[in-house]
Amino acid sequence: MCLAVPMKITRIDGFAATCEAKGIAREVSLFMLQGEPLDVGDHVLIHVGYAIQKVSEDEARSAWELFDEILEHA
């Protein structure tokens, strides 16, 4: 099973980006989404350092709400 974490793009430099979620920033590769138009402020799913899918802000928020609920009951 794979887990992808939704993050918001805060900086783009070619195929590299800085993404943020829950106060944590990470450098990620946009290489796998090179055919997708991406801008600062967009949300993407991150898996092992790669953005693998663009998602809406609502989808990202829903995922984090689910993660928070799971952690609350862990």
Give the residues covered by each predicted segment.
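Short nucleic-acid-contacting surface segments enriched for D/E, G, S/T with interspersed K/R
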Residues: Q34-L45
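Anionic group-transfer/hydrolysis microenvironments
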Residues: K22, F31, G49
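C-terminal structural segments of small proteins and small subunits
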Residues: H43-A74
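Conserved hydrophobic positions within beta-strands
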Residues: P6-I9
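SH3/SH3-like beta-barrel fold
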Residues: A17-A21
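Beta-strand/loop nucleic-acid-binding surfaces
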Residues: A25-G35
